[in-house]
Amino acid sequence: DHLRALDSSVNEKEIAEKFGWKYYLPEAKQEESVNVKLAEIRSNYKDLKPTDILCIDPCMGSGHILIAMFDVLMDIYTSTGYSEREAAFEIVEHNIHGLDIDQRAYQLAYFAVMMKGRGYNRRFFRGRDDVKPMPKVYAIAESNDILRSHLSLFGQSMEVKRRETAKEQMEYLL
């Protein structure tokens, strides 16, 4: 919808073929009132940047959905002019988030996201501007016994900005 908002002459089927999507269903005909509402929604997408897209898998397991999201996001980023190298960092930094209650699943998901980034950028592990990539995937054991006052102890080894963001996200989840 974002590409269509930028250029109404865009052909959905051609976009699907360009992205290499195997399955495509054209948009079904709608009532006029629905078309009006869709046009309104699409106009809101006109200024959408790829970094504004938030994808979260609340039960990420070993990260299969995160990796599928990574590929779709890579198509979006490259279609808007990003190189695959730069897009790999942007996706990990801005788009993909995952949670799981199993520590081992978290480790597998973290590994999967890091390897996917490495697949698109040979220098991915080195980081960008001296900042190492840090996938936003987390293991949440159980929150029944977590007190909000304990959040002040959370993330002491993280840089201040990342710690504050993580604490805000944790407060929201609690």
Q: Where are the language model's segments positioned?
A:
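SAM-dependent methyltransferase catalytic region
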Residues: 1-174
